[in-house]
Structures are given as C-alpha cells and as structure tokens.
Amino acid sequence: MKLNGLQYTDGARHSKKRLGRGTSSGLGKTAGKGHKGQNARTGGGVRPGFEGGQTPIFRRLPKVGFTNLTTKKYVLLNLSDLEKLGLNEINHQTLVAKKVLKNEKELIKILGNGTISKSVNVKVNKVSQTAKTAIEKAGGKVEVI
C-alpha cells in the first residue's frame, strides 16, 4: 500500500448536488428551494439565534461575570513533579530545556503536593509556604524572582 494508491471506499462519499441544471436532473428550475417565500429569495432565511419573533434564549438569560484582563496564568508544579525531573537547579531555562515550559516568559508556581528528597536550588515566580519549607528542609534554596 502506498500513499498515492489510497482511495475512498465505494459509497463513502456522495457526489455534489448540481443545482439548476435542467428539469430532468430533479434539481432544475427552483433548485430545491420550492416556490417563492423567504427561503427562495437571495440572502433568504433567518439569522442564527432567531426564534420566530419570540425573545431568543441569549436575551432571556442574564449576563454573568466578566473576564479579568490583568489575570496572570501560572504553570503549577508540585514537589512530586520536581522529584521526577531529577534536576539540581530549577529555573526557566532548565524547565524549557526539559519541555515543561513552552518558553521562558511563562510564570511558574511551586506547590507542596508530594515530597522531595534531594537538595534543589529553585528560582521561580511564586512558591507556596509548604513547598518552601519542604525544599529548605531537604537542603535546597528558594529564590522568588
């Protein structure tokens, strides 16, 4: 089997409807639109969300909440994640190299879930109090940048 020999299974694809190509085609003259009426006209039909004049659902439901434009998204790493990485130094460059971060502009926060056994030097944007004490107890250093 080669890529240039691939074919669709028989009956897997329908042929395109050719509209308005003579009455014997079955889709000539009115081209499947019927006679007159809103949907027979050019640009005919109702807009999305129109419910026949009834107040549409998007107007019946209340507005809720807002999007905070100044919020900061942090990449969350637990102590168990740091243990799995097996690095002596945790910073933006090492995490990008290990493909934990996409780029160096991402913000990092270390959380205290799990345990850490060896000393690690951590240089991140935020650290929880439990994570900080656990890292320092294991002989590591924490620097918030």
Swiss-Prot record:
Annotated Gly residues bias: 42-52
Gene Ontology terms, MF aspect: rRNA binding; structural constituent of ribosome
Keyword rRNA-binding among UniProt keywords: yes
Pfam families to which the protein is assigned, alphabetical: Ribosomal_L27A (PF00828)
Residues covered by region (Disordered): 1-54
Superkingdom, natural source: Bacteria
GO cellular component: cytosolic large ribosomal subunit
Signal peptide location: none
Keywords for this protein: Ribonucleoprotein, Ribosomal protein, RNA-binding, rRNA-binding
GO annotation terms (biological process): translation
InterPro entries: Ribosomal_uL15, Ribosomal_uL15/eL18, Ribosomal_uL15/eL18_sf, Ribosomal_uL15_bac-type, Ribosomal_uL15_CS
Function: Binds to the 23S rRNA.
Record text on subunit structure and interactions: Part of the 50S ribosomal subunit.
Record-stated family: Belongs to the universal ribosomal protein uL15 family.
Name recorded for this polypeptide: Large ribosomal subunit protein uL15
Encoding gene (name): rplO
